[in-house]
């Protein structure tokens, strides 16, 4: 018979033509597309992984621009106006209080849900956390 391979939810790999350009052709880089609600990992200009994310809602948008991972925490308590989220897993801050991290409190990836951070399923956040280093470029585009 015929063998079908069905990727895990959210792990659809866009073609190179569909994926945004990385900020560098050398080394590792991360791109987050707010309009696509998707994160991309690149090595030497080649996309190696992509997954659905949840970025900031309209009232609390994710910051756009070019940044770098400046600190990583295996888990971090996060708080802001009206919320406290303890032990947020696999947190990588890239600009002030904006981070890429795991979200154990929702499973609505693919649509804006956050207070400005880039939410990933916990297992995907683990992959990005293990792969990325301090200083890895992060580009957030509309």
Regions found by a protein language model. Name each.
Residues 16-57:
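A structural motif detector for short, solvent-exposed N-terminal "entry" segments of globular domains
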Residues 9, 44, 53, 72, ...:
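Surface loops and adjacent helix of pleckstrin homology
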Residues 1-20:
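Extracellular LysM carbohydrate-binding repeats and other cell-envelope/extracellular binding modules
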Residues 2-3, 13, 25, 36-37, ...:
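Residue-identity detector for glutamine
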Residues 6, 50-51, 102, 115:
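Short capping micro-motif at the N-terminus of alpha-helices
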Residues 23-25, 57-66, 71-142:
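Exported/periplasmic cell-wall-interacting domains
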Residues 6, 32, 53, 69, ...:
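Hydrophobic aliphatic residue packing
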């Amino acid at each position: 018979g015929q063998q079908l391979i069905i990727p895990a939810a959210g792990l659809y790999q866009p073609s190179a033509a569909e994926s945004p350009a990385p900020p560098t052709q050398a080394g590792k880089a991360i791109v987050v597309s707010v309009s696509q609600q998707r994160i991309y990992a690149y090595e030497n200009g080649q996309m190696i992984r992509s997954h659905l994310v949840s970025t900031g809602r309209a009232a609390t948008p994710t910051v756009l621009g070019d940044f770098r991972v400046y600190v990583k925490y295996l888990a971090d308590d996060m708080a802001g106006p009206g919320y406290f989220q303890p032990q947020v897993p696999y947190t990588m801050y890239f600009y002030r209080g904006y981070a890429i991290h795991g979200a154990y409190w929702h499973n609505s990836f693919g649509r804006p849900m956050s207070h400005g951070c880039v939410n990933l399923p916990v297992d995907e956040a683990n992959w990005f956390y293990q792969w990325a280093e301090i200083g890895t470029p992060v580009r957030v585009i509309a």
